[in-house]
Amino acid sequence: MEPNSYGSGKAAVGDGVGAPMLQTAPAPAPIPSANAPPPFLVKTYDMVDDPSTDKIVSWSPTNNSFVVWDPPEFAKDLLPKYFKHNNFSSFVRQLNTYGFRKVDPDRWEFANEGFLRGQKHLLKSISRRKPAHGHAQQQQQPHGNAQQQMQPPGHSASVGACVEVGKFGLEEEVERLKRDKNVLMQELVRLRQQQQATDNQLQGMVQRLQGMELRQQQMMSFLAKAVNRPGFLAQFVQQQNESNKRIAEGSKKRRIKQDIESQDPSVTPADGQIVKYQPGINEAAKAMLRELSKLDSSPRLDNFSNSPESFLIGDGSPQSNASSGRVSGVTLQEVPPTSGKPLLNTASAIAGQSLLPATSEMQSSHLGTCSEIINNQLSNIIPLVGGEDLHPGSLSASDMIMPELSQLQGILPENNTDVIGCDSFMDTSAVEGKVGLDIIGSCLSPGADIDWQSGLLDEIEEFPSVGDPFWEKFLQSPCSPDAAMDDDISNTSETKPQINGWDKTQNMEHLTEQMGATNIKQQKHMI
């Protein structure tokens, strides 16, 4: 019945248009009964309540609204059956006319307070809404237009209701389409970003593949050229062996360098200072023998055994690596003899890199009576070289020649070095029952310019100066004419290098023969 009323509205519009032409008043619209619900609501209720149509339209779980699940099927099958048309938008606009609202914007669900499941009698409470802008449209018409003034009020209300329902449906559709468009735009942006990232990865992969192909071609060409060369394999193996050897030699050299650094704790003193040097007895004795035998470049004596019965103790080699402007002292400790025979006294000499061409001569012998004078005058000087049996002998003043200061320069040891004063030439370790003679060297010369240390000078109570009467007594004291061992120190300077494997008996026999020959030569020379 609702379509009929809707059609009657159209007829009213037509009558309104043609009324001025016929000059007849239109018939008033039929007013429905107040107790009967609108036919549109009754048909809609029957359609929703039909169980056979639940797949297309049905009640919601709350039973206070209905949902159109399949709008295309709804417009195709149900609308023509109940409402004689198939326009779904017209159905939505008609619902809006009766005050239905859309519950969920994402699906077609409509609700009304009087449209409840199982309560069909409430449909009477639902009435058609009157548009608020119906009277405004009438006021906007010109007052002189008699045709518009003669329009019935029912016609204006029906037109306003249709406009309101259409506006509501279109706005909902527009909002839904906008939301869908935004979702699609976001998805499109995300897909474009993924496409760009994929394109970049593909380009990088293509470049890497091209580089790999190029390197492979270069490698193949190189291998082809190398294989054609006949000596390629032999040269490659040789280079590999040489590199392995260099690595091994480098590691060995590093170990040797570390060992040398660990064995070289010496510290180079400043210029003009005196260095206390205590090398092995064998080294110092050989240096003293070279000085006493007037040899410019004397041959080295071979190292003997380190046993207490050997003639020379120690097996070291002289080390003199100092500058010419430095002065060093050599200290020799006494060698304890094991037999009753007098052994050859050992002495020390100082040699440097800048020795004078002419060396001084110094002869010594075993002293008998002179030992008392030495003990009295040099009570603070510790004996460095001594013998158990001292025999009296003769020693002239002309034979005692003190070495020059320049001859004391140049020896810097690699170990056991201390920067001290001139009095460091005396050893502080005295041996009981032993009397020795310390060759002082140029420290006694009047022209020596040496900085004395007060701390060390306190240890020497009275050191004899150059003009001291001690030296006159020492040089003029009578000694035994026994000259068998008179020049024993100088005799040993002409001995040829020996082999370390000699035993003690061979050493003594060879030394005795050399001493006898040397004594005869020296006696002839003195005559």
Swiss-Prot record:
Residue span of region Disordered: 128-158, 241-273, 297-341
DNA-binding region: 39-133
Record field: compositional bias (Low complexity): 134-152
Record's keyword annotation contains Cell membrane: no
GO molecular-function terms, A-Z: DNA-binding transcription factor activity; sequence-specific DNA binding
Compositionally biased tracts (Polar residues): 317-326
Stored Pfam families: HSF_DNA-bind
Keywords, comma-separated and alphabetical: Activator, DNA-binding, Nucleus, Phosphoprotein, Stress response, Transcription, Transcription regulation
UniProt-annotated location(s): Nucleus
InterPro entries found in the cross-reference section: HSF_DNA-bd, WH-like_DNA-bd_sf, WH_DNA-bd_sf
GO biological process: cellular response to heat; regulation of transcription by RNA polymerase II
Disulphide linkage map: none
Keyword Disulfide bond: no
One GO cellular component term noted in the UniProt record for this chain: nucleus
PTM: Exhibits temperature-dependent phosphorylation.
Protein task: DNA-binding protein that specifically binds heat shock promoter elements (HSE) and activates transcription.
Assembly and interaction partners: Homotrimer.
Membership in a protein family: Belongs to the HSF family.
PANTHER family: HEAT SHOCK TRANSCRIPTION FACTOR, HEAT STRESS TRANSCRIPTION FACTOR A-1D
Protein name: Heat shock factor protein HSF8
